[in-house]
UniProtKB/Swiss-Prot annotation:
Record keywords, A-Z: Cytoplasm, Hydrolase
GO cellular component: urease complex
Family from the record: Belongs to the urease beta subunit family.
Compartments where located: Cytoplasm
EC number: 3.5.1.5
Pfam families, A to Z: Urease_beta
Catalysed reactions listed for this entry: urea + 2 H2O + H(+) = hydrogencarbonate + 2 NH4(+)
Pathway given in the UniProt record: Nitrogen metabolism; urea degradation; CO(2) and NH(3) from urea (urease route): step 1/1
Assembly behavior: Heterotrimer of UreA (gamma), UreB (beta) and UreC (alpha) subunits. Three heterotrimers associate to form the active enzyme.
Protein name per Swiss-Prot or TrEMBL: Urease subunit beta
């Protein structure tokens, strides 16, 4: 067996399917602003920048269905469909733009 290298990653062979089996909501999003808007993987999408136009009610309690630590950037005038998945765990949303600051299912 080869010696271990500090910090080395030893992934299992094959592919990982992110968020397997989670319900997906697809929404059309448009940036109506004059500056780019970037939204991170775990941001409560309903509270995203006001320049983004989309169904915020449908986005309540959801985040982007993208790998953790990544983001989607919307350039001015850009429009695209995004996939959202529900927050899991205890489903408490604290911070962001302060619109919820508590349980999503209350």
């Amino acid at each position: 067996m080869a010696p271990l290298i500090p910090g080395e990653l030893l992934p299992e062979p094959g592919e990982l399917e992110l968020n397997a089996g989670r319900p997906v909501t697809t929404l059309s999003v448009a940036n109506s602003g004059d500056r780019p808007v970037q939204v991170g993987s775990h941001f409560h999408f309903a509270e995203a920048n006001a320049a983004l136009q989309f169904d915020r009610t449908a986005a309540r309690g959801q985040r982007l269905d993208i790998p953790a630590g990544t983001a989607i950037r919307f350039e001015p005038g850009d429009s695209r469909d995004v996939n959202l998945i529900p927050f899991a765990g205890n489903r408490r949303v604290i911070g962001f733009n302060g619109q919820i600051n508590g349980p999503l299912d209350a």
